[in-house]
Amino acid sequence: MKDSSGHPVVCNHNKVGFLGLLVTIGIVFGDIGTSPLYVMKAILHTGEAIDESTILGALSCIIWTLTLQTTIKYVCVALRADNNGEGGILALYALLRRLKSKWIYILAIIGASTLLADGIITPAITVTTAIEGLESISPNLPVTPITLAIITIIFFVQRFGTESIGKSFGVFMLLWFLLLGIIGVISITTFPMILKAFNPYYAVILLAKSPQWFLILGAVFLCTTGAEALYSDLGHCGRKNIAISWAFVKTMLILNYLGQGAWVLNHVQTAYSVNPFFAIMPQNILVFAIIMATGAAIVASQALISGTFSILSEAMNLHFWPRMRIKHPTHVKGQLYIPVINLAMYIGVVLIILLFRDSSRMEAAYGLAITITMLMTTLLLGFYLHSKGMARLFTILFIGTYCTIEGIFLTANLSKFLAGGWCAMLISGILFLMMYVWVRAMKIRRQYISTKPLDDYYQIISDIKADEDIPKYASNLVYVNHADKQGTVDDKLLYSIINKQPKRADHYWLINMEFVDTPDTLEYSCETLVPDTLYSVTMHIGFRIEPRVSLYLRQVVEDLVDSKKVDLTSTYPSLRKNGIPGDFRFIIIHRVYYPESSVNRQQNLLMTIYALISKIGIDEPKALGLDTSMVVVERVPLIINHHIGSIRRIAQIVEE
């Protein structure tokens, strides 16, 4: 089969080489690569007195956070926890969902919802900070309108795809990181003692003695917020490319942070009033640096928007999120565009910009959500290591170490809750509620689907086919079978064929869709249940693949016809004479929930919220990629309360 968009698969740049490394730098490190724009500024705004011990301690915290959190946890450990080459919290969950722990999905949806919330906040703070650099040239420049204009353009171009400009991201980000490193080295030469920050002693002393340690750590954490995105992009670039390019990126980042620290210690009196990132830039290249910063912010925003589309596409196949219309603006595999989500993200980013106005206030909203994502990833990695037979001691040490580190960062970021962290938690909470309700409601719907053994109905289906007194409904009649167990069939499907309106056809097709734990699987198996009459097709679809049943069934039928396992030529003499194939018609059984069908108030509330959430999605025929002109939807009630009272006779009719 071809990919989900119907196009041939386009290979990703997973091979190690200059091109692969260049593409990796452009795709993976946009978020973490723009952190120098605001991290040092956020540290200075904690209120801690500026002196050598404070700056050395803060820089030491940055260096060792990048080392422990990004390098060891994500590059060395998490990148090895891949799902057939794919990474990210949902890909990791897909590896683990067969485990006996029924609540493990809670960790996944908490992590996914907080990661999505971060994807709304990051473009706002990154672009705003870059544009604020213009204030050093023209203090009265309207930052907010310019930021909103850039954000509008970024979201508007999503519908056209970014294939053409995306190829230049790698070159641009390479120049960006070189700029960070070179300017950092120049600034370091003015205060070489800043290199003492590599000693973790200064970090320990600062955190032990400073009364503002939690505020400082909250600011320091911003340097590693892009680490989760690094893991999510594993499938695009490959582990080796990410690991090798990270060595270069980390070096450039640390050099720039050290350069900013050197400038602060040389300008203690004025450090509070300016952004050290722009302050270390020579005046003759300041405009160029601002342009580069804006471009890097756009690249970072683009990566997060694309990442959001990918996460929600995975969530749909994992039954965490309602099916939505997905477009493929280019022929590049994996490049998606979800119009509803693009609009929702745009509105969210605009509201955050208008609510907080400047990047200093946005810093309070930033970091809290992604800390929770990282904590959930740590717990899932612990399950993964245990499932792979890793030494128990190592697994316990890993979970204990990183739960402690991230727990401390979480505590530090919670101190910013009232100042803006509530915004991230509000967005995360709404997304979590939607995912949780969707998962629970889908389980309820599956729980109350009644099934019957399919082989009990072979004869009657054959009899209906042969009964010419029944008008022919279609040459080929296709049903999507929602029964979980092999060899069983949804009883409402049988009711549709036999009872509701007997449907005579030449061939009956039952489509079983199995969403598998691997990302890009697209396979099928076909079983002939009744020769020349009844067929069962099972489609195995990876969690990154968009289901398009019409397209896939056409390929299945072509395979069967070519191998002479089925003859689909129309049975009408005039059409058969000319070799015209018979028509296809799809029947979708749609269960409608009625609140009065359950006496459980909690269940009623959950299903009512589910009904509201489902309105943002698309109906089942579109969700399955069916040609709606060939589809008939039959609505049946979803009966949850089977204990229906009997009617009591109150009078007898006497016949005279």
Regions found by a protein language model. Give the residues of each.
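The structured alpha-helical core of multi-pass membrane proteins
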Residues: 2-656
